[in-house]
């Protein structure tokens, strides 16, 4: 069956393009700052963002993905720095996406699914954490409306299980007329 919805490669490129300047805008003085992810500092959040992309690449390339590594975030940033490390891993993930048959089923900790559907999970992680990182470092936290809508679409069927697993806090209720960004943030347990 063909991939339904937006082109995962184009969406991945768009999300990386949105997150890259936020990564670049983080200063060394901000690394110990708190984030909307209350258990993580800016440094921990960056390490998580890097680990999620490594995990995504491992799943798509059918190597041995380590789900636990995404939570192992209390260590120094890579020696090349956050921006360079993020560019390197997202370039690797993008190359993997471009070479993979995204209709082929991959085994994930979330169950079996086509690779094109799976990559939407790390994409949504980046969409949400772009906001977290921007808020924590005083940068523009605006999420593109189409990406926010995509995040809602991906997160809605998975959020209950994510809450049970401790990945999301309780939903923050926002008005029905709220922007897609605010609805995504509320759904993911964040106060817009």
Where are these regions (language model features)?
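N-terminal cationic and glycine-rich segments that engage phosphates or anionic surfaces
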Residues: 45
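Glycine-rich loop at the start of a catalytic domain that most often binds anionic cofactors/ligands
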Residues: 48-49
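Structured surface interface patches that mediate subunit assembly and partner/cofactor docking
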Residues: 2-14, 18, 25-38, 58-70, ...
């Amino acid at each position: 069956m063909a991939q339904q919805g937006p082109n995962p490669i184009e969406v991945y490129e768009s999300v990386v393009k949105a997150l890259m300047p936020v990564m670049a805008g983080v200063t060394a003085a901000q690394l110990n700052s708190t984030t909307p992810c209350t258990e993580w500092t800016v440094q921990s959040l960056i390490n998580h963002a890097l680990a999620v992309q490594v995990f995504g690449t491992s799943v798509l390339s059918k190597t041995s993905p380590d789900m636990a590594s995404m939570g192992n975030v209390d260590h120094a940033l890579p020696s090349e720095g956050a921006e360079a490390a993020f560019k390197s891993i997202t370039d690797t993930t993008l190359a993997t996406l471009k070479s993979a048959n995204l209709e082929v089923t991959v085994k994930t900790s979330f169950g079996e699914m086509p690779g094109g559907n799976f990559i939407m999970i790390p994409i949504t992680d980046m969409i949400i954490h772009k906001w977290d990182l921007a808020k924590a470092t005083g940068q523009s936290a605006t999420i593109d409306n189409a990406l926010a809508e995509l995040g809602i679409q991906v997160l809605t069927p998975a959020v209950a299980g994510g809450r049970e697993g401790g990945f999301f806090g309780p939903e923050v209720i926002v008005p029905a007329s709220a922007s897609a960004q605010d609805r995504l943030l509320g759904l993911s347990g964040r106060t817009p």
